């Protein structure tokens, strides 16, 4: 049974202190992307805690080079929070591009990265997915247990699989879903 990383997910936060890996793993397991063979016990998804946003931005070019060197269908996903200083995902993506370009990453290589940016935090998405509402102008409530995190991720996967329109989604969730769909469409080619 092959065991190979197909999706590398960089995220903010410290190991053991972030809900991001729980949400990421539950979401990707439930989505079952066709290009990532999710065998039982395989490590096709690798989450990498990067601390704060500056560290995440600095680490991304090296991880992208690693993914490109692995070849095949290895995908780099970057999960981050859109804090008060970032209006939308495109502005934060531009900060990543500035650093990547300085590190010798081409635009074509950069465009292979899937960016997933939650405003104000991932907890806002979880609040929306579990209750149907959230206010992205404030931080969503902190979560102490993994069960609601995994349940929200599975709810999002179900909406993605069913092709449910993302109207009504918080703006950052709709933006991130479009990025996922672009990856999915690219992998079908």
Describe the role of every protein-language-model region.
Residues 1-6, 18-48, 54-189:
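C-terminal accessory helical subdomains adjacent to catalytic cores in phosphodiester-
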Residues 9-12:
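Short hydrophobic beta-strand that contains or immediately precedes a catalytic carboxylate
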